[in-house]
Amino acid sequence: MKQSFQNTRYRAILLLTGLMLAMTAMAQTLTNDALDLSGMWRFQLDPMGFGKTPGSELYLDKLSETIMLPGSTDQGGKGIKNTARYVDRLSRKFEYQGAAWYQREVVIPEDWADREIYLKLERCHWETTVYVDDKEAGMKEHLSTPNTFVLTPLLAPGIHTLTICVNNTLKYPMDQWNHGTTEYTQTNWNGIAGDISLYAKEKAHIRQINVYPDVSSKAVEVSVQPAPLKTGQTGKLELCIREQGGKIIVRQTLNADSLQVHAGIRQTLPMGNRVKLWDEFTPYLYEIEASWNVDGKTDTQTRTFGMRNVEQGKHHIRLNGRDIHLRGVLDCAVFPLTGYPSTNVDDWKRIF
């Protein structure tokens, strides 16, 4: 009788484990080498900031609450309930300042075994630390641009626990009227408001391209950062700049070994004597295409850029040798329902 009970118990545990794995797999959507991680996450507030303290590490625990992402703690009803209502600023239903922890399982496909894996967290507020299982993967604090983490060494195929600590404590000196953290424009919200995804790339790929126009020399300096090569490997980089109509201005090819790739590849490309400058009235753009080939596999990326020179004048900012006046509108509190800026293109089209 006892043996039968134990067998039944073990079968039940195996069944529940299988169901949990299936639910985890269903909660992530694989599309075009990317895993969409939006949806329900486990959650826990950490107002005292003990979650990174040895012996109290929250990334080692299974968090007890839940919250939807993308979103904020305000939207999830987390924090201190606020009954005050204001006429001169946004009125938050819930307020929270401090560390908040978000957690879920992810399933890495088998065909990602020999690829570079990145985590993209768009529009975080603010300091964001990522953990995979029991290892810290890094910390970033970008606001308007995505926080991107390289997780390749930590994500073998299979199931892993991904934990993210977002801390909206004001760690830098701020003016009391600043637009990034006060209710007069948005709020000091905590969360991740945009794209949350894992994506995979071939080992041979371009991580970053930067273009630096130099109007005085009629040239651009191009900085290309490929993913690291193995010792002894070499890659071939082809750079091509085109006018808007497609006419090729310059094309160059160069080889790089693992040490050069580690340092980053920089190359100056001439734009010719008839280079067209960019300003708000004649916003002429060029396109640069970078193709990186390693062992027969190629990653090609493009960027657009304008040739312009910005400098400080006596009383004005100067653009291409002329004094300019910058104009704009003060779009305060244009997202009152969320308290944070949208990452949806249609929302910005409506405003513009």
Residues of each region from the PLM?
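Secreted/periplasmic carbohydrate-active enzymes, especially glycoside hydrolases
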Residues: 1-18, 25-352
